[in-house]
Amino acid sequence: SPLARAVETAQPLAARWRCEVAIEDRVAEIPSPTDDLAERAQWLQRAMQGSWSELAQASQTWRQALVDALLAQPSDCIIFSHFVAINAAVGAATQDDRMRIFAPDNCSVTTLDNGDGKLSVEALGVTAETHIN
């Protein structure tokens, strides 16, 4: 993800492996219909209680772009992303339309596979209750 928290989290591993961090915009956090942070938090809290099919087309398009990015990975990789994006990927992999499947903790590792042109979940990351902002 191009967002600061994901890039900062990726840096120690990139330094250890002596490689560059590639930025993939499609795995950034879900865009919200407002730039106001308080309104975004309220929108996201409401949205997280529902399903993808209840959201505006822009959110569904974002989710499909994220899935397409994951399916396009040609080899094993590590992707540093965010709560909603991880849930979107897990939901797509398990055919679950809920926005919130689980609550991945900060820096937890969720493992997906994109073999045979479809996503599947190999392991969910450690969970923790997270404040949505």
For each feature predicted by the language model, list its residue ranges:
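Active-site signature of alpha/beta-hydrolase-fold catalytic machinery across serine-
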Residues: 12, 88, 92
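Internal catalytic-core helix/loop-beta-alpha segment
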Residues: 47-74
